[in-house]
Amino acid sequence: MDQGGRSSGSGGGGAEQGKYRGVRRRPWGKYAAEIRDSRKHGERVWLGTFDTAEDAARAYDRAAYSMRGKAAILNFPHEYNMGTGSSSTAANSSSSSQQVFEFEYLDDSVLDELLEYGENYNKTHNINMGKRQ
C-alpha cells in the first residue's frame, strides 16, 4: 500500500478495482463506495454509486473522516486540513457535485412545533394540503 492507503493493484492502467480505498468498479462501469463502521461490528455502510472512481473515493473519505476524524486513512489526505478539529471545512474542500447533510436528532417536541408552524402558515396563506378530489 502507498501513503494514501491505496493498494497498488495489478494489471493495466485506468481505475482498476482496488485503486482507492472503499471503492469497487461495477461491471457496467460505475463505481460503488462503501465503508465498514467499526461502531457496528464492521457492518458495511453503503455510500452510493458514482460515475468516477475519484467521486466514490471522496465519498469514502468524507465518511471515514466523519467516523474516525484525524485517525482516518483517506484516499486524498491533502484535501483535509488535519491540523484543525473541524471536519465541516474538510468536506467542503471536495470538488464533488455530491452534498453531504448531517442531521441532528431533535426530540418530538421540535417536530411538533415545526408541524404546527406549517399548519398555521398554510391556514394564514389559504393553502389546502388536503386530498384532491
Swiss-Prot record:
Biological process, per Gene Ontology: defense response; ethylene-activated signaling pathway
Q: Which residue stretches belong to region Disordered?
A: 1-22
| A GO cellular-component term linked to this record | nucleus
What are the protein's UniProt keywords? Answer: Activator, DNA-binding, Ethylene signaling pathway, Nucleus, Plant defense, Transcription, Transcription regulation
- KW S-adenosyl-L-methionine (keyword) present: no
Organism per entry: Arabidopsis thaliana
Residue ranges annotated as motif Nuclear localization signal: 24-40
What the protein does comes down to: Acts as a transcriptional activator. Binds to the GCC-box pathogenesis-related promoter element. Involved in the regulation of gene expression by stress factors and by components of stress signal transduction pathways.
Q: Member of which family?
A: Belongs to the AP2/ERF transcription factor family. ERF subfamily.
Q: Which residues bind DNA?
A: 19-77
Q: Which gene encodes it?
A: ERF14
Task: Provide the protein name.
Answer: Ethylene-responsive transcription factor 14
Q: Which domain of life is it from?
A: Eukaryota
